[in-house]
Amino acid sequence: HVFGVVMCLAVIFSSCGSNSSKSDDIKPKEVVSANKEVVTLALMPIVDCLPYYYAEERGYFERFGVSVKIATYKSKLDCDTAIVGRSALVGYSDLFHAMMMSEGRKVSVVNSTQGGWSLMVNKSLRIKKTSQLSYKTTAISRFSTEAYLLSSIPKTDEVLLPQVNDLYLRTSMVDNNQVDAAMLPEPFATQCRMRGHKAIWTAVSANNFGCMLTADKVKGAEEEKKIIAITKAYNMAVDSLNARNNMRENLSGILAKWGMQEFPVDSLHVPTYSHAASFKKEDIAAVSQFLRTRNCRFRSSGVLVNDRFCKKAETH
């Protein structure tokens, strides 16, 4: 079964072969209750997913009656495998991946996410603007948020785009001058800045098309209740993060889980989050246009813009 899931994703993202090695979970902290089944969230160590890590640290999931284990992955493709293989009830991805996966396996968007991206350039290069990137190597993950954002920047048509899905590897390649530049989310972009590399383009808290997905086979009342509870905990974490109440200790623990113990908490850019919300029709249209111009097979049905989880999390 697992082999079948992996092969399915390999076909869907046939042009997206990962340069990363097989992902190892980064020692997720488990919250276990003797009377509850533990559900897994497949997340990435980025600001988009921060409210879920924060909710775990603060015990918000248990407050809403769900026991959660967080599995941390280094790439969206690894999260996708966990989602469609049902080893995770909910997982992080983006709208580009969701629409391509829906061509072969149905998935539903639970809610969109928020975070920042930057185009980081190696400090040894005399590059100050994006027009100077022609025939330079910029590491990205193809058919994804970062590819879309890069395509929206003027005069980047001739940039060379090696695919590096693993964010730790992508950051390391900038550090070691193995690529000229990379599109990086927070906090990896800030980590690069701290090492002297330059940001020549930044989108802070922009619509980055990140999202939480669940396999569309999740239709049972119990599983839906768990997803709603997870979304309620997300909203509570958002309120706490936005209020900036006693964040420091919790964020230190989260950064340690992300393998960024040396990262100063005060340097972490925490955006002003919104409560869980679905994508808008114009988001679907923008992603559809991007995928269509690249001859990608995808599905853009209403399942991707439904807001049943978000609405129920606010009203129940």
Regions found by a protein language model. Name each.
Residues 48, 57, 76-79, 97, ...:
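Stable alpha-helical elements in mature extracytoplasmic
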Residues 1-3:
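Bacterial N-terminal signal peptides that target proteins for export
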Residues 17-20:
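Bacterial signal peptide processing site
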Residues 221-297:
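Secondary-structure end/capping motifs
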Residues 24-157, 161-163, 173, 180-184, ...:
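Short, glycine-/small- and polar/acidic-enriched structural segments
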Residues 292-316:
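Conserved C-terminal helix/tail region of periplasmic/extracytoplasmic solute-binding proteins
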Residues 12-15:
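C-terminal motif of bacterial Sec signal peptides marking the signal peptidase cleavage site
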Residues 95-96, 125, 158, 166-254:
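Pocket-lining segment of extracytoplasmic ligand-binding domains
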